A protein has these predicted regions:
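Short acidic active-site motifs
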Residues: 83, 109, 133-137, 159-160
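Short amphipathic alpha-helical segments
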Residues: 88, 138-139
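Short glycine-/small-residue-rich flexible loop motifs, especially phosphate/cofactor-binding loops
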Residues: 22, 63, 139, 161-162
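Secondary-structure transition/capping motifs at alpha-helix termini
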Residues: 93-95, 167-170
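Catalytic cores of alpha/beta
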Residues: 107-117, 156-169
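Oxyanion-binding "anion nests"
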Residues: 142, 149, 165
Length: 171
C-alpha cells in the first residue's frame, strides 16, 4: 500500500510542487515560510518516532532512551500487544503515547486490537485499516475503541481529505 491506491503519480507531482515552491522562494529572496504567510510559531512540540522493533524489551529500551534524551511524547509503529504494553509500562501515564500501524488490518481485526489497546491510554492510533481511504472503517474503529484516530499520509488530494473529515473518520 506504500502509495495508497492512487499510485505514485500523485506523489511524484507533490515533489514537483515542492520544487516549484522552493524556486519561488529563492526567486523572491525569502524563506518559503515567509512567502506563504510567515511563521506562526517559533517552537513546535515533537515526539520520538520509532521503527517497528517487535521485541518488547527493545521497545521499552528505546522508550526509556527517548525520555532520557528529553522527548516528551513517543510514537510507535508496533502491531503486537506485548510491544505496545512494554512501551506503556516504560512511559509514564502523563507522557503521550501514539501508535501508527501503517494500514495493517482489515476492519474486524482493527477493532479487536484497538479495543484491547484502550487500556494503554493512547493519544491516537494512526491508520489502522486497509485500504487507507476506507473512511467508514476508520470511523468504526474509532467509535468501537474510543481511541482517537489519525490518518491521511496516504491521501493525495484535497477532495480525499474533505471526504475523510466529512465521514468523521479522524478526531
Amino acid at each position: 500500500h506504500i502509495f495508497g491506491r492512487f499510485g505514485i503519480t500523485a506523489f511524484a507531482l507533490s515533489g514537483l510542487d515542492i520544487a516549484l515552491w522552493d524556486i519561488a522562494g529563492k526567486a523572491a529572496g525569502v524563506p518559503l515560510h515567509r512567502l506563504i504567510g510567515g511563521a506562526r510559531r517559533t517552537r513546535i512540540p515533537c515526539y520520538a518516532s520509532f521503527l517497528r522493533y517487535t521485541e518488547p524489551r527493545l521497545v521499552a529500551q528505546y522508550c526509556e532512551r527517548a525520555l532520557g534524551e528529553g522527548y516528551t511524547a513517543i510514537k510507535l509503529h508496533e502491531i503486537d500487544d506485548a510491544a505496545v504494553q512494554a512501551a506503556r509500562h516504560a512511559v509514564p501515564a502523563q507522557v503521550p503515547l501514539t501508535v501508527d500501524v501503517n494500514c495493517e488490518w482489515r476492519l474486524r481485526e482493527a477493532i479487536e486490537v484497538a479495543s484491547r489497546w484502550r487500556s494503554h491510554a493512547l493519544l491516537w492510533l494512526e491508520e489502522p485499516v486497509f485500504p487507507p481511504e476506507d473512511f467508514r472503517a476508520l470511523r468504526a474503529v474509532g467509535e468501537a475503541s474510543g481511541i482517537p484516530l489519525a490518518a491521511g499520509e496516504n491521501l493525495c488530494f484535497a477532495t480525499q481529505f474533505e471526504a475523510m473529515l466529512d465521514a468523521g473518520a479522524v478526531q
